[in-house]
């Protein structure tokens, strides 16, 4: 049985999603969701049920199955013969997969137990997007090594800023609960706020470097990468706006010691601009305008 999705106006590319692929995507989603249920159950357990805050050694192990199957399905969705497809649904799914992968890797070195209650549920929902919003057009110039490098770097930058945004949300909740004197049990496994803040700026610095490389390669090699000179579209404007926001934030941290709520607001503003730059433009073109 086949569920077909096509570009009705242009009819450029016919993309079919098989029942097998749908079931496999559901399996990935249920894998993430099942893990999320257990994580939230442990997170909301009364303090008396946990004598001391402990790490959950089983969580990274349990994450291997959905993470690996998710990677396989993304590979099949993106690489179709000699063509390369990366629609808005697949792009978001790749970003959340990279986000989970980075979190999974870092969890062996940092205490990030509280962050997993946000990352894993998001993966459960967004891993289904390649089925709901499949690509309808192949990307151009995908044979160029420079294009592939540009694409990989940009997706890594998005993933790091996604982690930074989730990190900021967790810090905001933690700060509010500390002031109220009512810190949830799962947040007691997190490092102190100052340690989390230092980690946040490390993440943002790494993302800023990758974003700089993405924008720089787009400017210098625009004609080779995209077949036309760089144009100041809303995608370009929002991309540079996010670069300015994150750059100003890092400069403010270095020069004036910015921290706390100021850093949180700047992080979310930069991430929102980045979402509008890439995901927003792809959504409008592919879903609304069907181009």
PLM regions and their residue ranges:
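Hydrophobic transmembrane alpha-helical segments in integral membrane proteins
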Residues: 17-32, 157-161, 288-289
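N-terminal signal-anchor/start-transfer transmembrane helix
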Residues: 25-47
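Cytoplasmic-side transmembrane-helix entry/capping segments in multi-pass membrane proteins
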Residues: 54-60, 89-90, 113-124, 263-268
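Membrane-interface helix-loop-helix modules in multi-pass inner-membrane proteins
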Residues: 69-118, 219-237
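Hydrophobic alpha-helical segments and helix pairs
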Residues: 107-156
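Transmembrane alpha-helical segments of integral membrane proteins
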Residues: 217-222, 243-257
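Interfacial loop-to-transmembrane junctions
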Residues: 251-273
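Juxtamembrane boundary at the C-terminal end of a transmembrane helix
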Residues: 278-291
């Amino acid at each position: 049985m086949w569920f077909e999705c096509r570009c009705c106006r242009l009819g450029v590319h016919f993309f079919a999603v098989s029942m097998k692929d749908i079931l496999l995507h559901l399996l990935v989603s249920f894998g993430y969701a099942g893990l999320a249920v257990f994580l939230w159950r442990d997170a909301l357990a009364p303090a008396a049920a946990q004598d001391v805050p402990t790490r959950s050694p089983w969580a990274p192990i349990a994450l291997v199955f959905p993470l690996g199957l998710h990677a396989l399905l993304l590979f099949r969705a993106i690489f179709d013969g000699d063509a390369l497809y990366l629609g808005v649904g697949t792009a978001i799914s790749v970003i959340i997969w990279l986000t989970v992968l980075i979190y999974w890797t870092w969890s062996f070195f940092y205490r990030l137990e509280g962050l997993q209650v946000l990352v894993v549920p998001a993966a459960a929902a967004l891993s289904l997007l390649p089925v709901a919003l499949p690509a309808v057009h192949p990307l151009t110039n995908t044979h160029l090594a420079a294009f592939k490098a540009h694409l990989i770097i940009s997706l890594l930058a998005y993933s790091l800023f996604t982690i930074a945004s989730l990190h900021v949300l967790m810090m905001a909740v933690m700060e509010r609960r500390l002031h109220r004197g009512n810190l949830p049990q799962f947040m007691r496994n997190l490092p102190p706020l100052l340690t989390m803040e230092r980690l946040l700026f490390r993440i943002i610095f790494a993302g800023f470097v990758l974003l700089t490389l993405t924008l720089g390669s787009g400017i210098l090699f625009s004609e080779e990468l995209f077949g036309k000179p760089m144009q100041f579209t809303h995608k370009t404007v929002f991309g540079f706006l996010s670069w300015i926001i994150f750059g100003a934030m890092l400069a403010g941290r270095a020069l004036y010691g910015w921290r706390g709520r100021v850093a949180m607001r700047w992080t979310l503003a930069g991430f929102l601009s980045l979402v509008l730059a890439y995901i927003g433009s792809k959504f409008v073109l592919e879903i609304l305008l069907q181009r």
